[in-house]
């Protein structure tokens, strides 16, 4: 099999061709736009209900679960965004699988396959926790959330380490830029997740005014840094096209 960037294809057999940048932006814009819509709508039109806490202390921000899963039209908008973006995310995971097979040393290739598997499980867990909300099915939502977080953190760490330590060739400038973003976004994500966990435990233990607001804020940072991390694919596949043809299926090419 030829490397993805050298494959030649017959135009008659090509189903579609598009710049990878468009695919990356589409995969990000749907959940990002849905997330901001849900938070802003909740603050403007469902502030009292979405910021209510079990001990009725002062709170100024809805949690992610409250913003995206408890009220309409937020619930429908978020589900639609996740449903539409899932095929794009799975396509990107497939492209990364090809990328790791060609750019990662043979001795580390299984780790690349594992990273792609974790990415797919993360995507499916996000789908599940979005369609089975905490209000509708708490146990399913909780389990999907645990799987999502575990796979997300493991995937981000493995993706960073594979690109830093396991490559066969030297990083290009745009790949170095992607690697720096991966490192920084992963570190901020882990820190925000730890602080969100601390605020959640403290809120449940003490019911102090404003603590749940910080919990929600750190939740937002976790969500946004996760999206940002996946957006680094924009630089990983800089100036490449996504092609799907009858012979090779889905792959990347410079042509």
Swiss-Prot record:
Topology within the bilayer: Multi-pass membrane protein
Compartments, record wording: Golgi apparatus membrane; Endoplasmic reticulum membrane
Disulfide cysteine pairs (residue numbers): none
UniProt similarity note: Belongs to the PGAP2 family.
Function in brief: Involved in the lipid remodeling steps of GPI-anchor maturation. Required for stable expression of GPI-anchored proteins at the cell surface.
Record-annotated membrane-spanning stretches: 25-45, 80-100, 111-131, 143-163, 185-205, 209-229
Keyword terms: Endoplasmic reticulum, Golgi apparatus, GPI-anchor biosynthesis, Membrane, Transmembrane, Transmembrane helix
The organism's place on the tree of life at top rank: Eukaryota
Listed GO CC annotations: endoplasmic reticulum membrane; Golgi membrane
GO BP annotation list: GPI anchor biosynthetic process
Protein name listed in UniProt: Post-GPI attachment to proteins factor 2
PANTHER family: FGF RECEPTOR ACTIVATING PROTEIN 1, POST-GPI ATTACHMENT TO PROTEINS FACTOR 2
Subcellular location, principal: Golgi
Record-linked InterPro entries: Frag1/DRAM/Sfk1, PGAP2
